[in-house]
């Protein structure tokens, strides 16, 4: 274990809820539909988060719980049945329908598991129903994907075939690139979870080796282990360093010589480091403060310090799974301050006291900080953008160099007018 400084903090939080994950999950599985059982606030959140990204009829919606539902004066189950029947009659192409719980549905104890069971019997052979919680009562927004994948694990058939399973949503082009690299390394049976079609779930078993692409899938990992899968612990594939070690860990699990891995990835790494240079010129020596929201913070801190030369003031993370993050923690400087959890007022006080050059935070905090003259980067962009892999290292760095470059340009223009 690294000697980083680990701290815990509790108090008021400022994060999105797990419903936000629907935005990238519904892009990943175009044959699925996500039906949020929640309030009008839930509907507004999803529409706002996804509205700018939808270029066709969306594959998500909200079954609205009215005030009389929340007060127990109406049967929410009847209304949900009506919405589902109407939806399936209008959208016969739906193969999997996710019933997504929310804060309101959990408050009134709406049993979506029982609802899903009944609907599976009614629509047997036509539509598969799966339920999970996207509530933000005790979770952050990326855990919505964890809940969705965990709900799918029991539906995955068993196999003894040896395979590498990449777990966590990736952009399709990044997934294709990863599979191609692994094929060159010598691993030919590579599958992804979630798959591109919700009905084509990979089979798993004792010879399935799981390599995570995202750090926020603790519950999914636990269930995959219970199914007999072997978990490969590695840094996450962000940047040249993390991606290289990730490929090496995957190869080692299949007893492939690391010289073969280096032979395949060395040309990619050299090109990526050259592409990084224009960004490191801007980022090197700049002070970075990461507020907790996505659970990507530790991996991002490692990349931005080790490969881009940024100075880490504080690395916040909503939750810290030490088993999954140990390899990442070992790559951080020993004096790195990591804070698990959040007391948003205290953290904002520390931001103001340390005057960072860049703060990675949620959208709700970005505008107030910008108004105080502090450059920010939305953490949710890291989930919506294709940032994984050696080839994407420069694009990842660019997400952080651009706000600093913009600030430099604005500052120079302001000075020129005086």
UniProtKB/Swiss-Prot annotation:
Cite the cofactor comment: Binds 1 [4Fe-4S] cluster per heterodimer. The cluster is bound at the heterodimer interface by residues from both subunits.
Q: Kindly indicate whether the keyword Cytoplasm belongs to this entry.
A: no
User: Matching SUPFAM superfamilies, A to Z?
Assistant: Helical backbone' metal receptor
Q: Which residues bind [4Fe-4S] cluster?
A: 17, 42, 103
Cofactor(s) recorded for this entry are: [4Fe-4S] cluster
- What is catalysed by this protein? chlorophyllide a + oxidized 2[4Fe-4S]-[ferredoxin] + 2 ADP + 2 phosphate = protochlorophyllide a + reduced 2[4Fe-4S]-[ferredoxin] + 2 ATP + 2 H2O
- UniProt-listed GO biological process terms: light-independent chlorophyll biosynthetic process; photosynthesis, dark reaction
Q: In which pathway does it act?
A: Porphyrin-containing compound metabolism; chlorophyll biosynthesis (light-independent)
Ordered alphabetically, the record's keywords are: 4Fe-4S, ATP-binding, Chlorophyll biosynthesis, Iron, Iron-sulfur, Metal-binding, Nucleotide-binding, Oxidoreductase, Photosynthesis
Q: What is its EC number?
A: 1.3.7.7
Q: How does it assemble?
A: Protochlorophyllide reductase is composed of three subunits; ChlL, ChlN and ChlB. Forms a heterotetramer of two ChlB and two ChlN subunits.
Can you say what this protein is called?
A: Light-independent protochlorophyllide reductase subunit N
Q: Which organism is it from?
A: Prochlorococcus marinus (strain MIT 9312)
């Amino acid at each position: 274990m690294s000697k980083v400084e680990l701290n815990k903090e509790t108090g008021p939080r400022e994060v999105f809820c797990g419903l936000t994950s629907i935005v990238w999950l519904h892009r990943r599985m175009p044959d699925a539909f996500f039906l949020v059982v929640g309030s009008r606030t839930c509907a507004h959140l999803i529409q706002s988060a996804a509205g700018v990204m939808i270029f066709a009829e969306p594959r998500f919606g909200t079954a609205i719980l009215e005030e009389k539902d929340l007060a127990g004066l109406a049967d929410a189950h009847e209304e949900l049945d009506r919405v589902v029947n109407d939806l399936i009659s209008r959208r016969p192409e739906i193969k999997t329908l996710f019933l997504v719980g929310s804060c309101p549905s959990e408050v009134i104890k709406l049993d979506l598991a029982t609802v899903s069971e009944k609907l599976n019997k009614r629509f047997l052979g036509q539509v598969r129903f799966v339920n999970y919680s996207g509530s933000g009562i005790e979770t952050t927004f990326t855990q919505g994907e964890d809940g969705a994948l965990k709900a799918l694990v029991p539906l995955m058939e068993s196999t003894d075939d040896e395979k590498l399973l990449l777990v966590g949503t990736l952009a399709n082009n990044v997934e294709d690139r990863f599979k191609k690299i692994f094929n060159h390394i010598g691993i030919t049976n590579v599958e992804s979870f979630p798959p591109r079609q919700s009905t084509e779930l990979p089979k798993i078993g004792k010879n399935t080796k799981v390599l995570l692409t995202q750090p926020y899938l603790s519950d999914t990992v636990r269930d995959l282990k219970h199914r007999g899968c072997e978990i490969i612990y590695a840094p996450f594939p962000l940047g040249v360093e993390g991606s290289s070690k990730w490929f090496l860990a995957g190869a080692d699990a299949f007893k492939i010589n690391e010289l073969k891995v280096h032979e395949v990835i060395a040309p990619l790494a050299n090109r990526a480091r050259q592409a990084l240079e224009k960004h490191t010129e801007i980022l090197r020596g700049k002070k970075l403060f990461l507020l907790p929201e996505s659970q990507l913070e530790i991996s991002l801190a490692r990349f931005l310090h080790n490969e881009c030369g940024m100075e880490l003031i504080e690395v916040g993370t909503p939750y810290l799974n030490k088993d999954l993050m140990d390899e990442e923690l070992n790559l951080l400087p020993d004096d790195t301050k990591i804070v698990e959890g959040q007391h948003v007022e205290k953290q904002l006080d520390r931001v103001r006291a340390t005057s960072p050059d860049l703060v990675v935070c949620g959208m709700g905090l970005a505008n107030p900080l910008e108004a105080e003259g502090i450059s920010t980067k939305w953490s949710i962009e890291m989930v919506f953008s294709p940032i994984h892999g050696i080839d994407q290292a420069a694009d990842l760095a660019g997400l952080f160099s651009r706000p600093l470059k913009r600030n430099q340009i604005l500052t120079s223009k302001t000075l020129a007018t005086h």
